[in-house]
Curated annotation (Swiss-Prot):
Residues 219-378 form the TrmE-type G domain. The gene is mnmE. Its main location: cytoplasm. It comes from Acinetobacter baumannii (strain ATCC 17978 / DSM 105126 / CIP 53.77 / LMG 1025 / NCDC KC755 / 5377). InterPro entries: G_TrmE, GTP-bd, GTP-bd_TrmE_N, GTPase_MnmE, MnmE_dom2, MnmE_helical, P-loop_NTPase, Small_GTP-bd. Mg(2+) binds at S233, T254. This is tRNA modification GTPase MnmE. It comes from the Bacteria. GO terms for cellular component: cytosol.
Length: 454
């Protein structure tokens, strides 16, 4: 698509805030070259050729010096004239240069506006634009590789292939409607049903891959909870591979919620260690317990850690602590300190719940726990896994619902017009993923989550 509203020239700092050897400011828009030339008081270098320039203030004094790179439209990131100014990376000088660009006619870029313009000018689709942010925010190598695949168009290609099938199906249905004398033959000969079922299977295949991509992007929220001194902090340290939490023999040592971002078998995990759940008069510890309950309610997976030496029934503990939150999909029972009881580290079933015996301090059974966590999440990415977001899965879910409606209208009622309407809605839902069909408020929400300089 070609964007006609970008008559303004935007500017923003493109490097992370703070001190650094190099700081980059990006300009994009019809006046980018004119503004950069006024800043440098010299002709700009040739396209894609680095040129050393001084940067001047309004009174002619030198503010900084550095490299200037020019990218003429339409062969630039945004599809507009783009200039990158590479100066020194201190926040004071970077903000001063940015202020000078505003004086010369640029305006401040909104969050994600550079990527928004690239999308609107047809330089990338919506999935690829999102992949830029996902690559920057990747918390594991596997997530980064998947984001690169999405950026290169792997996800978009799959969606576009399904869209082509869906459009082809719509053409056949529309033909049946346009030529009513042939309607019975078109709708009843089985060809349209076969095409419809093929589209459903194709969407399902993409959904399966997208769920893996969503796990890579969003990871899993895992909470370690249990009685004080059950070994929760030791287990966090064993999983994280670093001594992060305070580990002592004093009950109630962990008084706050500790977070650790790690990768288990390639799956990004936010591991949370909570305060021990118990009655206490200590004000600080009460606050820790309040936060622990909140984390437990929001967790994707809960590891209930208990001391095998105490003879506790883990399921009774879970029922006491978590009440309505306990279910096999969200809870694993972890019997800790098996080295002190002489038990072997193993995985078993305990009344329908996964039960794992470990020794966190001795790291016995820890790898088995890691494997159980990733298997529990259904995480098994392939080499061609692409990054995906919740909105992508939601769009595919709605697509499948509309396709199911279309199938019912075809098989049960033989109602061609209703089939056509359901297929139209399915195409619109699927088209939201790449941006072929997207409301303005959806675009604003997506790009508004980006960095300012992206």
């Amino acid at each position: 698509m070609n964007n006609m509203h970008s008559q303004t020239t935007i500017a923003a700092i493109a490097t992370p805030p703070g001190r650094g050897g190099v700081g980059v400011i990006r300009l994009s828009g019809p006046k980018a070259y004119d503004i950069a030339q006024k800043l440098t008081q010299k002709n700009l270098p040739e396209a894609r050729m680095a040129g050393f320039r001084k940067f001047y203030d309004a009174d002619g004094s030198i503010m900084d010096e550095g490299i200037v790179l020019c990218f003429p439209n339409p062969h630039s990131f945004t599809g507009e004239d783009v200039v990158e100014l590479q100066g020194h990376g201190g926040p004071v000088i970077q903000n001063a240069l940015l202020g000078r660009l505003f004086e010369l006619g640029a305006i401040a870029a909104k969050a994600g506006e550079f990527s928004m313009r690239a999308f609107e000018n047809g330089k990338m689709d919506l999935v690829q634009a999102e992949a830029i942010a996902d690559l920057i925010d990747a918390t594991s190598q596997a997530a980064a590789r998947s984001a690169v695949r999405s950026l290169q168009g792997a996800f978009s290609t799959k969606i576009n292939t399904v869209l082509e099938k869906l459009i082809y199906l719509r053409l056949h249905v529309e033909a049946a409607i346009d030529f009513p004398e042939e309607e019975i033959d078109f709708l009843a000969d089985g060809k349209i049903l076969a095409l419809l079922e093929d589209v459903q299977q194709s969407v399902h295949a993409v959904q399966t891959s997208a769920r893996q991509g969503q796990l890579l992007r969003e990871g899993l929220q895992v909470v370690i909870a249990g009685k004080p001194n059950a070994g929760k902090s030791s287990l966090l340290n064993a999983l994280a591979g670093v001594e992060r939490a305070i580990v002592t023999d004093i009950a109630g040592t962990t008084r706050d919620v500790l977070h650790e971002k790690i990768s288990l078998n390639g799956l990004p995990i936010t591991l949370t260690d909570t305060a021990g759940l118990r009655e206490t008069g200590d004000i600080v510890e009460k606050e820790g317990i309040r936060r622990a309950i909140k984390e437990i309610e929001q967790a994707d997976l809960l590891l209930l850690v208990y001391d095998l030496n105490q003879g506790d029934d883990p399921l009774k503990l879970a029922q006491e602590y978590f009440s309505e939150h306990i279910e096999p999909r969200r809870l694993m029972l972890i019997g800790n300190k098996c080295d002190l009881t002489g038990q072997s580290a193993e995985i078993s079933d305990y009344q329908g719940f996964r039960h794992i015996t470990v020794s966190a301090k001795q790291e016995m059974g820890v790898q088995g726990l890691v494997d159980a966590i990733t298997a529990h999440a259904g995480f098994h990415p392939e080499e061609d896994t692409f990054i995906a977001r919740t909105r992508h899965l939601d769009a595919m879910k709605r697509t499948q619902l509309y396709l199911a409606e279309a199938r019912e209208q075809l098989v049960v009622f033989n109602a061609g017009e209703l089939v056509a309407e359901s297929l139209r809605l399915a195409q619109n839902a699927l088209g939201e993923i790449t941006g072929d069909f997207s409301a303005d408020d959806l675009l604003g929400k997506i790009f508004g989550s980006f960095c300012i300089g992206k």
